[in-house]
A protein has these predicted regions:
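Acidic donor-binding loop of glycosyltransferase active sites
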Residues: 185, 285, 300-314, 325-327
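Carbohydrate-associated surface elements
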Residues: 193, 210-213
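Nucleotide-activated donor-binding/catalytic signature segment of Leloir-type glycosyltransferases, i.e.
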Residues: 261-297, 301, 347-349
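Short hydrophobic beta-strand element within catalytic cores of glycosyltransferases
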Residues: 318-321, 328-335
Length: 405
């Protein structure tokens, strides 16, 4: 089978963020069994060595320059993009990454009959799919998270960067998601929650849930519990949901924990920390570490991994990676989305918390009880091994591509 995968995000190395992790690992699985062509965009910090590394993973690699970021474009262009959003329904964030050169190449590749399947790795790539493609080949969109549900959730939780803009955008995003899904023969979501949201827009659509996975070689189970009072958060630190999570935890939870356990530290590990995150480094016990060569080394040194997400839909790689590494997890409903970790009918695999007092209680329990840490460590790792590997996800994705889901 000849597969054309589209990813405006350069997916290598698969340590930069959640989009890269999911895209690369599904690509890696498919390329072992099929002929895979990847069309992607090169961002400013992508090195020639990284391009060579990605090229080794596919049969054909087509790279295009990423268009200038909207932050560097003029106000007139931004107004034009918003006008197009109102008229045609395509959000400025999608138009911002649109490459005419990439579109021309994709059109030619499809018209020449060089692929049997075309996949969009993240919904932002839907812009390259012409409505008539469905007549020629199977079209798949891999929705990492519903843009409408995410915007609605950010407004509901009060963490929107611009609430007036997002209130205007919300009905437009609903229309956008409904319209773009109609161009695809199959839709993939990461959680049942997202599937329900997307099914509401497109009752007749074929929607398959394929959760994220973990590379168990890159995230081995830790051999010892070092104890102590070390907390960690992992994730790309230019992501709005992650920024909100660490700011919320640092300001509203950590000071209360430190009253009970004064030596508590909080490591924030992940690439591209923005000024709001860097400023947290001035607070007692907080270490903003940035990008590291090995995330698992930092996880293994931690007592607990916290995932205090208040927004952001879809399954969280950070939660799965911590579980794979054998680190006990305390997380919010958003951080545990798509995972059966607690409740009467499930083995206890993580502790759930949403309010500051709930975090204090859960973290205190784990600090004080090594046997509880061991229980979560064992059960979390077992869950990942049996349900959340990239091999399992890759097989499911292959079935969707083959039309056998």
């Amino acid at each position: 089978m000849n597969i054309l995968m589209l990813s405006s995000t350069f997916p290598y190395p698969p340590t930069r963020g959640g989009t890269q992790v999911r895209t690369f690992n599904l690509l890696k699985y498919l390329s072992q069994r099929h002929t895979v062509t990847l069309a992607t965009q090169r961002e400013g910090d992508v090195t020639d060595a990284e391009i060579a590394g990605l090229r080794d993973c596919v049969d054909h690699l087509a790279i295009f320059e990423r268009p200038p970021d909207s932050a560097t474009t003029g106000i007139l262009q931004k107004i034009q993009r918003f006008g197009r959003f109102l008229q045609q329904g395509t959000p400025p964030s999608v138009l911002n990454r649109y490459s005419v050169e990439m579109q021309t190449w994709i059109d030619s590749w499809v018209e020449a009959g060089k692929c049997d399947v075309i996949t969009c790795e993240h919904s932002v790539n839907e812009i390259y799919i012409q409505s008539h493609f469905q007549k020629q080949l199977k079209t798949i969109v891999n929705v990492h998270s519903s843009v409408y549900a995410t915007c609605r959730n950010q407004l509901a939780t009060g963490i929107s960067e611009n609430s007036l803009r997002d209130k205007i955008n919300l009905p437009l995003l609903r229309r956008y998601e409904q319209n773009y899904c109609a161009k695809f023969s199959a839709i993939v979501a990461t959680t049942e929650e997202d599937k329900i949201q997307l099914q509401e827009f497109n009752p007749n659509s074929e929607i398959t849930v394929i959760p994220n996975g973990v590379d168990l070689v890159s995230f081995p189970n830790r051999t010892t519990d070092l104890g102590g009072h070390r907390l960690i958060f992992i994730g790309a630190m230019d992501n709005l949901a992650n920024i909100d999570a660490v700011c919320f935890f640092s300001n509203e939870v950590l000071p209360e924990i430190q009253k009970l356990y004064p030596d508590t530290t909080f490591d924030i590990v992940g690439s591209h920390p923005v000024p709001a995150v860097l400023a947290l480094d001035q607070k007692p016990g907080i270490n903003v570490i940035g990008r590291v060569p090995s995330m698992v080394e930092y996880l293994h040194q931690a007592t607990i991994c916290v995932v205090p997400m208040r927004t952001g839909f879809g399954i969280k790689n950070k939660t799965l990676e911590a579980m794979a590494a054998g680190v006990p997890v305390v997380a919010s409903d958003r951080g545990l989305e798509g995972l059966a970790v607690d409740g009467a009918s499930h083995t206890l695999r993580a502790l759930r918390a949403n309010k500051p007092a709930e975090y204090v209680t859960a973290i205190s329990q784990l600090f004080d009880h090594p046997h509880l840490r061991l229980e979560l460590s064992h059960n979390g790792r077992q869950l990942v091994e049996t349900e959340f590997t990239w091999d399992i996800a890759g097989k499911s994705y292959e079935q969707v591509c083959l039309g056998k889901e």
